[in-house]
């Protein structure tokens, strides 16, 4: 698409000058947009670097203006002015616990923002497996549905276990929400109990439901008939496993007929940590998983071929309305939702969301989102982890557009201060 797209397509103010798959993209000004030539930046180069330490070094050395800086590395650029003397004193950069009162080290600008960006993990109700001989880095690879559950008891495998609400509910109780909010994200994730983030209309229609409770998770699996019966050494992604004879069972058998695949991409240490935790937790209650971090090519193949079961991701709003979360998160494709390709269709949720998005009566909308939440917690299609409230950092010569809670900043709204006689002219 980048090679064959129409002139100026996709970027408007900037054109794709060159690109290398999974490596970099270079943008230059589009003369049809900047007729008077008054563009701010004459070239944008964006490079994919999966290793956090490499990104940190490039940013510290000034090779790049922006970078995906890990939370634990922010102490290199920011500190908390604990004694309010306007200076960096010994120990003030040991931790950034008081994030709203962040201060900046020389050469950087650190800013705390409370956002509507949501961190989540989506469930795939109709997972597939790559067909024999297909390449894991080919996004056009052929894949087939994994049918491993008999929903009617007639002996025919007619669906996937991920279609059962009980399994998804149990998985939701195997995630350690508070540890990830406090430790993995260093208190940069605020609790979020449903699709609507705090600060939006009708956020109060949601209450804390899912917590880290492996005892409950295991009880849900047992009640749903997912008992320990499969020889774990025979499990694969799609083939039938060996059922252990009742007399030979030791209690260490697996509960599901196939391995659940958990998607996390290389370079995102937070997703990797969350994937590792839930994989370990599920393993303790008899659910086998595969959760190693994937290189970007393999990650994209899993996404496009639907060869995944649980996928860690995120969401930033396009507009400030609760339906901008509810519909893409948990609305069915039939009502224009399901942005994450979960295959989720819950009639009660859909009906409530249609009312919520179309009614102009406040009480009616509130009740609609209450109804949607009540139906969703019995049949969840994702784990909603939290909303990001944290610190961002940039070099002090980078001029940014005013912060907006929706969407993302446009490339053409950035500027850089000129350096004259060794000093920056102006301020950001």
Annotate the PLM regions.
Residues 12-15, 25-26, 42-47, 256-266, ...:
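Short, well-ordered beta-strand elements
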Residues 1-9, 78-108, 128-163, 230-259, ...:
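Surface-exposed intrinsically disordered loops and tails
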Residues 10-12, 23, 40-42, 117-119, ...:
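Envelope-exposed proteins and targeting segments
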Residues 59-60, 64-69, 81-90, 94-110, ...:
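Periplasmic binding protein-like
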Residues 17-28, 47-144, 178, 182-183, ...:
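Extracellular/periplasmic solute-recognition and catalytic clefts
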Residues 125-182, 349-366:
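Extended ligand-binding regions for polar small-molecule ligands
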Residues 20-24, 29, 112, 116-119, ...:
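Detector for C-terminal structural segments
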Residues 1-43, 51-54, 214-223, 420-421, ...:
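Gly/Pro-rich hinge or "lid" segments in bacterial periplasmic/extracellular proteins
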């Amino acid at each position: 698409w980048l090679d064959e797209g129409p002139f100026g397509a996709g970027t408007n103010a900037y054109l794709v000058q060159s690109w290398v798959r999974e490596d970099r993209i270079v943008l230059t000004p589009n003369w049809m947009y900047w007729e008077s030539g008054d563009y701010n930046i004459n070239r944008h180069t964006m490079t994919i670097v999966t290793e956090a330490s490499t990104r940190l070094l490039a940013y510290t050395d000034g090779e790049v203006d922006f970078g995906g800086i890990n939370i634990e590395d922010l102490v290199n650029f920011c500190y908390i002015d604990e004694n309010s003397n306007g200076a960096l004193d010994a120990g003030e950069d040991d931790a950034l616990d008081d994030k709203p009162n962040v201060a900046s080290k020389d050469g950087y600008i650190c800013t705390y923002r409370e956002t509507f960006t949501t961190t989540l993990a989506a469930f795939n109700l109709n997972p597939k497996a790559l067909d024999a001989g297909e390449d894991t880095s080919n996004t056009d690879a052929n894949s087939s549905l994994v049918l491993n559950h008999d929903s009617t008891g007639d002996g025919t495998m007619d669906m996937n276990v991920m279609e059962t609400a009980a399994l998804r509910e149990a998985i939701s109780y195997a995630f350690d929400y508070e540890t990830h909010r406090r430790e993995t994200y260093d208190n940069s994730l605020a609790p979020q109990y449903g699709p609507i983030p705090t600060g939006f209309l009708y956020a109060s229609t949601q209450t804390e439901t899912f917590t880290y409770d492996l005892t409950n998770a295991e009880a849900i699996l047992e009640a749903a008939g997912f008992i320990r019966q499969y020889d774990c050494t025979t499990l694969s992604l799609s083939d039938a496993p060996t059922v252990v004879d009742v007399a030979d069972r030791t209690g260490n058998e697996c509960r599901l007929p196939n391995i659940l695949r958990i998607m996390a991409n290389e370079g995102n240490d937070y997703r990797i940590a969350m994937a590792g935790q839930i994989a370990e937790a599920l393993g303790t209650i008899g659910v086998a998983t595969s959760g190693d971090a994937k290189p970007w090519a393999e990650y994209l193949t899993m996404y496009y071929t639907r060869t995944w079961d649980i996928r860690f991701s995120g969401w930033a709003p396009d507009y400030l309305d609760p339906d901008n979360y509810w519909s893409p998160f948990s609305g069915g494709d039939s009502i224009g939702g399901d942005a994450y390709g979960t295959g989720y269709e819950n009639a009660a949720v859909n009906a409530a969301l249609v009312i919520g998005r179309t009614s102009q009566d406040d009480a009616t909308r509130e009740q609609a989102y209450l109804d949607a939440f009540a139906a969703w917690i019995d049949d969840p299609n994702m784990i909603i982890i939290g909303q990001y409230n944290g610190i961002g950092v940039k070099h002090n010569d980078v001029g940014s557009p005013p912060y907006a809670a929706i969407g993302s900043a446009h490339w053409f709204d950035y500027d850089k201060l000129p350096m004259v006689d060794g000093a920056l002219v102006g301020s950001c």
